[in-house]
Amino acid sequence: CHACEVACKVANNNPAELNYIRVNTVGEVGSFDTATYDTASGTYPNLKLSFVPVQCQHCENPSCVAACPTGATKKDPDTGVVYVDSEQCIGCDSCITACPYEGVRTHVSADPEWYLDVVVGEHDAPIHAGNTVEKCTFCRNLINRGEEPACMQLCPGRARFWGDLDDPSSKVAELVAANEYVRLNESAGTEPSVYYLV
């Protein structure tokens, strides 16, 4: 339904060019390496099509953090969230090049444009400085207040979950333990923290 995309865009007051999440349609769930994008898999009448939200994978070993020459790309030691400090970012795109997950970062243009002439979203939403790189922060401002990221709060299908994977009693840890899952591009060695239940 793309509600997560809309919730994210509004909560973060993102400029028109900036999306932290994109929802891909995938024909074959279970192996993203061989997935068919924007095309159903199977044979009629037994076709399969799934919707897969893709954003920063907030890796345990983020290659983007190591590649950033200014230290602007950081990993929060308490939450594990990977984020970019716009005041330190020089817009060199090293993090984009280093990231094995295509399209999860955006280089914001020098003069970003908004859909509306008024600020929408959270009062403490990220500042969108021109000529910097931005990405999903799992709504750091919200999780620091004890709330869930906007994409998870507004998911009408309750298909998205947030929590501490190291806490076995958390909902997300229980779901991962009880279900089959895949993680994107595991061969890159970054240990993504986003799990897709199949």
Regions found by a protein language model. Name each.
Residues 1-198:
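Non-ligating segments of multi-cofactor redox enzymes
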